Amino acid sequence: MILRKTANGRNEPMNFKLFPVPMSKRSSKWIDGLRPEMPVSRAARKTLRRRLRPVGRWLADAADRAEASPEFVHQLRVSTRRAMAALEGYAELVPVRKYEKMTKLLGRIRKCAGTARDCDVFFDRLTESNDAEHWRPLAKRILELRAEAQEPIEKLHRKLRGGKFDHKVKKLVKKLQTPEHEQETTFVEWARHGLARNVSMFFEAGAADLGDVTLLHQFRIEGKHLRYALEYFSAAFGPEVRNELHAEVERAQTLLGIVNDHASAIEHLTTWRAEWEEPELHALLDERLATEQAALRDAKQEFHRWWTPQRATELRKRFASILELPDEEHAA
């Protein structure tokens, strides 16, 4: 369950049931209906509509129906990330002020959703373990934090309800422009250029010392950017992009996501250890810290067993071949 803060400031349990969100309601990761030779401005309009509109819908669900499923806030964070990535992918076509305002708004939504989602993930890990009863005092405190995290989500929704977010999306899409020197640019040309940049940054980050958690996190970020770019640019290329390249990058993201979950938990636990005063919670936090640190080591080892220099080299060559990118530009 989640605690909702009442008007008198008290936390009261919400009827939190883990009902799955129907797949039909979830936004597709792919942007269908695009053709390689279509003008990039048309591709941009369709892509940004498809990426931005779901944010408003998930925000409403995360605000009004959080007690029904943690999936709503999860989908809000995912849709916001995808929207920000698509906006960045077509940034040169968006008027500067529109771009800055929408990016700022999406950043606020993502931050709110991220805080709430972190609580949900950590709470689930505590309560789904075999010794859930042992962690109950800590889980209860996490629920209180989750209640606090719900308030900014609801506040943003109140500000944007009544079609206000959709109106912002329509205004932004309507203002999309193609600079004169880009008038003849096709979707595939734009996509190839954009992906070349993402691929380069991904492998550059992958060539760093990935034994360092900070550098490993940066590699994860670049991998996420590349994965989202593959999703909104995939229609410009053959099926190999969806079926092969995206699958490889997604696998890397899955393994790095596990690493990040444990690293994030350690960061939160350390902060709570410094802020909370209850001895009982201190003991649980110390115990959990040791557990998360061991799990982080295991997760890093699992990633490094999979992400080998040979795999990186082979993947780079496949990108160069399928996307017709010059291989030397992406050498580690």
Predicted stretch roles:
Residues 5, 11-332:
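Function-determining surface determinants
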